[in-house]
Regions:
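Short, conserved alpha-helical segments within structured domains
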Residues: 12, 33, 72-75
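AMP-binding/adenylate-forming catalytic domain of the ANL superfamily
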Residues: 66-78
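Acidic pyrophosphate-coordinating catalytic loop
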Residues: 40, 79-81
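Phosphopantetheine carrier-protein modules
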Residues: 21-42, 60-69
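Two-component histidine kinase catalytic core, primarily the HATPase_c
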Residues: 47
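Thiotemplate assembly-line natural product biosynthesis machinery
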Residues: 2-29, 81-88
Length: 88
């Protein structure tokens, strides 16, 4: 697995939205910053693993087990707040 340099929050959100919408595109629907990823059934047990792997690559480090909580992955905005930190 190639580890890339960490992304700033704004770029992280943009890239994550692009990745999610490309990967899980549904006719007539798209994922936004505040879309409920579990609530609207965009994520399942396999997709969350893919999302965790993508996030780890984007932030340049593994996510500790204790940070893998549903509330940290409920939306793109929540993921960015939790893992991408603030823009400098």
């Amino acid at each position: 697995m190639t580890v890339e340099p960490p992304m700033r929050r704004e770029r992280f959100e943009t890239e994550l939205l692009r990745w999610l919408n490309r990967r899980y595109l549904r006719p007539g629907a798209s994922i936004g910053r505040e879309t409920g990823l579990f609530q609207e059934r965009w994520l399942d047990s396999i997709r969350i693993l893919e999302l965790i792997a993508w996030t780890e690559r984007a932030i340049g480090r593994p996510i500790p087990d204790e940070q893998i909580r549903m509330d940290h992955f409920r939306s793109v905005a929540a993921i960015a707040r939790t893992f991408a930190g603030d823009d400098p």
